[in-house]
């Protein structure tokens, strides 16, 4: 089921309001118990002064960084999410698609100590985007990615390819969303080709769960 980037963005346009409600009401248990804390600790562990939240969604991570006096900037491709983020916090937030970011046709600032993408890299061709993000980092700056753990999400089909999220078990009105599954080696190859070196790999896990809740990658720019 090939899905162009525009189709993925359209699905976010349709699901934005439901997503805002789900995050702000704490409806996603794995985020409350494991993954929100995992990405926050990974970011704070680098002691950054300036952070870009790539695909910031409704802005929860920006607000957490604001509380800690970190200079944080957000960017997202959906106008509803950007508006919600701006209304709920004071961090600057840019409206830009990943294609615009990859082609460097928009200015979202530079000299970031760290760029994070929390469950925000769902399209197929991520290498141009990651390479563009690399150029926005200070020398030796870090990229922190949290994503679905490929060994958990594979569902018996461990190969790169498009999947469909139907939001089963979520409250509210949701439309199915395409997303691109990639294996662990595919993630590592993408980082390497975009000019990054992996320095840390984590598998956040709930103590009562037999499987990891996510995959968390920390990579440094080779510039």
Residue positions per predicted region:
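Class I SAM-dependent methyltransferase SAM/SAH-binding core
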Residues: 52, 58-103
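A short acidic, Gly/Pro-enriched loop at the edge of an enzyme's catalytic core
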Residues: 104-115
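A short SAM/SAH-binding and catalytic strip from SAM-dependent methyltransferases
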Residues: 114-127
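A short glycine-rich, Lys/Arg-flanked "PGG" loop and its adjoining helix->strand segment in the class I
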Residues: 128-142
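Short alpha-helix
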Residues: 178-201
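Core SAM-dependent methyltransferase catalytic element
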Residues: 209-223
């Amino acid at each position: 089921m090939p899905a162009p980037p525009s189709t993925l963005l359209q699905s976010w346009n349709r699901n934005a309001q439901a997503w805002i409600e789900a995050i702000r009401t704490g409806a996603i248990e794995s985020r409350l118990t494991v993954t929100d804390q995992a990405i926050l600790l990974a970011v704070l562990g680098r002691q950054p002064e300036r952070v870009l939240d790539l695909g910031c969604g409704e802005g929860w991570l920006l607000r957490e960084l604001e509380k800690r006096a970190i200079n944080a900037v957000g960017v997202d491709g959906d106008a509803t999410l950007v508006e919600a983020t701006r209304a709920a916090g004071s961090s600057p937030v840019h409206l830009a698609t990943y294609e615009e970011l990859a082609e460097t046709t928009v200015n979202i600032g530079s000299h970031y100590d760290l760029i994070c993408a929390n469950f925000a890299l769902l399209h197929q061709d991520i290498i141009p985007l990651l390479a563009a993000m690399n150029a926005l980092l200070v020398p030796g700056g870090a990229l922190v990615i949290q994503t679905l753990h490929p060994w958990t999400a594979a569902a018996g089909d461990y190969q790169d390819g498009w999947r469909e999220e139907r939001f089963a078990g979520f409250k509210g009105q949701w439309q199915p969303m395409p997303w691109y599954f990639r294996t662990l080696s595919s993630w590592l190859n993408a980082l390497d080709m975009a000019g990054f070196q992996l320095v840390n790999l984590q598998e956040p896990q709930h103590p009562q769960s037999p499987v990891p809740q996510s995959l968390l990658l920390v990579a440094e720019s080779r510039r």
